[in-house]
Amino acid sequence: MNRQSWLLNLSLLKTHPAFRAVFLARFISIVSLGLLGVAVPVQIQMMTHSTWQVGLSVTLTGGAMFIGLMVGGVLADRYERKKVILLARGTCGIGFIGLCVNALLPEPSLLAIYLLGLWDGFFASLGVTALLAATPALVGRENLMQAGAITMLTVRLGSVISPMLGGILLASGGVAWNYGLAAAGTFITLLPLLTLPRLPVPPQPRENPFIALLAAFRFLLASPLIGGIALLGGLVTMASAVRVLYPALAMSWQMSAAQIGLLYAAIPLGAAIGALTSGQLAHSVRPGLIMLVSTVGSFLAVGLFAIMPVWIAGVICLALFGWLSAISSLLQYTLLQTQTPENMLGRMNGLWTAQNVTGDAIGAALLGGLGAMMTPVASASVSGFGLVIIGLLLLLVLGELRRFRQTPPVSDAG
């Protein structure tokens, strides 16, 4: 990575064919999952006319994802990771085919949608954990920051493209097209993934999966560094749940429908800018301190967001949150991968990803509870400033993370 540039260096895609294959597979997978994410709630709403039923499907899928992350972490530390990745992707694609066939029936089954949602949520997250655990072996630990930033850009770009494409498909061909193309895209991802080298795991004693998972929890709690990283990650994800208040806040700002879209686009845009300008982040000597400060700054941006007098200022605050949270997340990812023992990478990546899933759900629930007691403006500002106080306390308490120093890596990627 070029020390003189703040911009992200994409040369890793040229110099590491295995990472290029993962990049391509991940992008196709994100677009495929995005098509699914648009189709499922629309189909359930059309069948039941019940927002509760739509919410139930999201909750069930989220629960299956959480279990899949836990199981995937254990499997990724026990079995050859390439096989786990391929098995998970292929099995997930079978579930998409099931959704497509169900949608083509004269009377689609609601129960089938719920069950296949559980199936796909479980196997999709199982493969994600194995892929995360394999990344250090594919790019080298010295290139993890660069790989993480490129991955973040991939996720953001795919997250923008897939809903638009999904909406067009719904308008022109119905939900069956979304499911069919999601299945096709998932099986296409197997082609680049088949080119990956073997990804064996370090030798370790066979033990009960629950005991193996418990060992990961013990490691997390016993390590002030890794534990602090996981805690910060969960809090940042909780803060991002402020999006549930966008519709109510848009009414107070008297925003048009087109302008409301800018609220939803602001955080991804800020995160993309954060990833693009992360060129020198890998060379920071005190990544823990930068992580803590950027996290507190992101909370402050959320607190200020709702009390802005005009919506444009609110959008700027959200973009600032996206930028600062991207910096924090990139440092979390890199330190987690570099400071976790190889034989525990699968389980720790599973736990780290799971706290992202649960943090978002907890944040949304807390904001919903606050919204029942106070105005949307007060709810957003109280949650943001409350997180600022917690963040400042953690800045003092997490001494090992704050003082952590590293030798800047010398990348061979460019």
Swiss-Prot record:
It holds the Pfam family MFS_3. Residues 1-21, 77-83, 131-156, 200-218, 278-287, 337-356, 400-414 are cytoplasmic. The chain crosses the membrane at residues 22-42, 56-76, 84-104, 110-130, 157-177, 179-199, 219-239, 257-277, 288-307, 314-336, 357-377, 379-399. GO terms for cellular component: plasma membrane. InterPro entries: Enterobactin_exp_EntS, MFS_dom, MFS_trans_sf, TM_effector. Signal peptide: none annotated. It is a multi-pass membrane protein. One of its GO terms (biological process) is response to antibiotic. Keywords: Cell inner membrane, Cell membrane, Membrane, Transmembrane, Transmembrane helix, Transport. The keyword Transmembrane applies. Its main location: membrane. It is found in: Cell inner membrane. One of its GO terms (molecular function) is enterobactin transmembrane transporter activity. Residues 43-55, 105-109, 178, 240-256, 308-313, 378 are periplasmic. PANTHER family: ENTEROBACTIN EXPORTER ENTS, INTEGRAL MEMBRANE EFFLUX PROTEIN-RELATED. Belongs to the major facilitator superfamily. EntS (TC 2.A.1.38) family. Component of an export pathway for enterobactin. HAMAP family: MFS_EntS. This is Enterobactin exporter EntS. It comes from Salmonella typhimurium (strain LT2 / SGSC1412 / ATCC 700720).
